[in-house]
Amino acid sequence: MVSNLESSIQNLTSAEYNCLADLNLYDSPECSRLATQAAAGRHLWVSDNFQDASVEVYLCEDDYPGWVSLSDVGLLQKATLPYRASRLSEADIKKLLPGAIAFTHQAMQQSNYYLWGGTVGPNYDCSGLMQAAFVSVGIWLPRDAYQQEAFTQAIAMAELEPGDLIFFGTPAKATHVGLYLGDGCYIHSSGKDKGRNGIGIDRLTETGDEVSRSYYQQLRGAGRVVKSYEPQGRK
């Protein structure tokens, strides 16, 4: 007798699917390290690259690749309508920023810890929190910090306004991102190493506490979200 899971695997084809529940995506076919997460309702494209225990997929909203365990394919349902991105003007986005900021404050009030690959509450990584906050008001950002930096409109630090993104890392690449709140403060999800192991508010200063100083030393610059990400249809 064929189980529901076995039936789901047998019927899985290269096509667009909806996530029926929150779903983990991994960075390799072994599914040993989390790459990102897909909230219930998201669209993903199942490729024809099947391995023994997983299949390669691409999230439709942000073109992000990953691997889904075949044990989770029962959480997928073939999409009846393809994903279509909404176009937003810069003025539209500006009106929505207070909602994105409010999302981060609400997330901080929940018990949470830093989770590499986390984009579904309560536990996030840095860029996952940014993506989730903006998606909560209908704005899509790319997934990773360096992608978000390239996607935003670069601005001088003196031009910072609440809702802008602040990037940290090495001279070569952005590896961390936070959301500017105003008055020299930003909110972010930081790890255990010189961070807060979760969501917290820090200051852009070299004279603050240890966490603020550590990130300020890695400051790269800032960017303004002026559009919503439109997928390139990667398959």
Which residue ranges define each predicted feature?
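Short beta-strand-centered aromatic/proline hotspots
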Residues: 46, 57-58, 176-181
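Conserved beta-strand/loop element in small beta-rich adapter and peptidoglycan-binding domains
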Residues: 32-50
